[in-house]
Amino acid sequence: MAGRSPDNDPQNLRAPRRRDGCSECRRKKVKCDLRRPVCSRCIRFPKECRYDSSFVAVRSHCRKSSPVRGKPRNPSPAKRSVIPLRASLNPLACLTCPDSHFLMHHFVTQTIRVLFPLAPPVFGQTLVATAMETPHLLHALLAASCSHYARLVQKPSAHQLTVLKFTNLAVAGLRAALADPTETLRPETAMTAMVLCTNDVCNGNARTWKVHLSGVTQLLTALLARHKTADGDPDPFFLCLLKWFAALDILAGLSGTHEGCVNDGQYWNLTRNPNCGNGHVDEICGYSTQLMPLLARIGQLARRNVHEQSIFETYTEPSSALSEELTHDAQDLETRILSIANQVPSAATLAFHDQVLASELHNTHLAFIHSALLHLYRRVELLPKSHPKVRAQVTAILYNVQAIKPFSPANALILWPIFSAGCETDDLQERQAIQTRMANMQTMGLGNFTRARDALARYWESGASSRWDVYFAQSGLELVLF
């Protein structure tokens, strides 16, 4: 009988097996390519790919030193109090928890691509690398990843405890960081609060997202005050954080009664910073940063109209002319919005993405431009839904939405425009097209998309004559169309 000799087995004609591979490759006794967070062999079953033992071994080996005879090994009381604290703050220890490797892999490959589908690669890479050195940020990312995964598989209750565990750890770590003056002025601290805020928005936690957003405002203000005394411009990662905050704050201010944390929409001169792609469509926001102060002003004027006309109690289409001041403001806003309509993605954006995706980014920008005009006409000038200027903006929004592929990543950027168009149309074909596109967007696993679609259907079914923002305010429903 011709049996196989171990010496002739090709599987044995290889270098000795490394001991720093993932747990699954070591168990199967196969070579691991050491890719993080999931190696190539485990890509189909990422939950089984763990590097926890290698983390411990490497750290233990690095810290090990030769004992010196005659000298005590016990540290002083002061040192003893530090050692367990440092060990507990090791972020890599988080990845030894069940499912943490899978959740980190899911965040890198899925969650961040849904939140910021066109962001420059350096943003995601830096975010994850920073989290590996910052426990509270890592916990926040794991909580966001778990929330997103739970919505994708439509089993939120099954993962609720895991989300809560990582959220509580992130909040505890954030509080500890805020108590330390040296930690408060680190971008990582503001980033943790921003991740928690965004996850609250996606989960519909109306009370806590405002608390976190207000905290981010204070942290960023302090950080930028320090930057003014330092040489050079903010790094790209920090600018992405600024734009992330600005995009959420702007849309929160336009979605309901939230006044915005930065009322004038200037966002620390983001719109005049050459490093923010001034004159181009921004990859984080999906529109030009020059539109930010104009959107903020529209939100201000809209809220002032609601207050002055007391339309929370009774609302009818306006029969009196606008004040001279408001008319002038509206005309100025219209001119300034139209002046930036033709902005296109930057050369850097074109280098990172294919031509189709870059073209869709221009469509997202135009969708925001026409949505801004729609809100200006309806909520500031108080034009009726049937007015030609209003109808023209609804048509233009839907034209640019249709120019974006149904399942393109760019759909993640257009929740506010498509919701705005849906609230201002009575045309059945337009409503059907909007519902179909929003159903596609809902499959991305962001909870605010689901709530927006449900709210729009509720508004349509009500047949209410009042404007959408008035209707939702009276109903006690608050949305953040981010």
Question: Predicted regions span which residues?
Answer:
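Intrinsically disordered, low-complexity activation-like regions
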Residues: 1-184, 202-482
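Acidic, glycine-rich active-site loops and adjacent beta-strand->loop/helix elements
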Residues: 196-200
